[in-house]
Each structure stands twice: as structure tokens, then as C-alpha cells.
Amino acid sequence: MTELSDESKQLRPGLWETINERYPGSMITKKEFVPLARLSKPLSQTRLTFVSSAGIQPRGTLPFDVVHPVGDFSFHRVPSTSKVSDLEIHQIKYPTTGALKDLNVIFPIERLQELSAEHVIGELTPNFFSFIGYQMDPSRFERTLAEEIANAVVADGAEAALLCPA
């Protein structure tokens, strides 16, 4: 087995440059690699959580602030046992037509429940996590929201996290 270079271990070479090209003003200046972690046991025995930037939340909870010029630096816990009918989307920064027809397109809660029931993946954490992806202050996002979500993921006992941008 050959040793992987530092560059091949990152999320994707040139990721931050690509984001800055596509979203001028995003202010991302990261130069370090984003490491990928290997699972220590089979996925079928791993406790999984889901983290999404889709702006999904339990119906009736305080909506995300989708009009603030720098974004909303909060997140919602979404019980992993939720039914799609118990959830709603609060997002205006991307087209939601497909998501309104089938929320699983961007927040695959039913598919994850099925995969867990079929023992393809281990059990699900009590909560999944969602925030709005429109964040124009990446440093603040990393210092506050990302740290808070990471702490919540750990507190929920996750052994692996599936991250899904909207």
C-alpha cells in the first residue's frame, strides 16, 4: 500500500480557490489541508449523524434569519426520528422547488432511517443538524457555528458524520 501525499488526503485540492472564484467576496483564505478520517469499524456498526446546510428545521420552530446580509450563525437540531411532514425548509439562497416536492433530495432523513433499519449503517444519533449555508463571514462561521455544531455532534455520541451542502 502506498503512502498518500498530504495533498491527496485533503477534501479536494484547490477547494477554497474554487469557492472564492465562484462566490466573490466569500473571503475564504484557508491554505491548510482538510484531513479525511478513516472509520475505525465497519459503517454498519458506526453511529452516524447528518449535518446539512439546507436550512431544514422542525415545523413550528423559530425560522432561520435568511435575510441578514452576513447569514445566520445558528443551527437547529432535527430529531433523527422525524417524519418529513414534521420538517420545513427556510432558505431563499437556492432554488427549493425539488426540496419542496421531496425533502429527501437535500435532507435524506428517510433514506438514512431506512439504511439504519437495514443495518447498512449503524444506529443514528438522536439528532441531525441543519443550518443555512449562506455565510459571508467564513472566519466567524468557523469560530462559532462550526465549533458549536461539532460540540453538539460529539455530545450526541456520533462516531461519523455525513456532511451535505445544499
Feature locations, PLM:
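Metallocofactor- and cofactor-centric catalytic cores in central/energy metabolism, strongly enriched
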Residues: 1-166
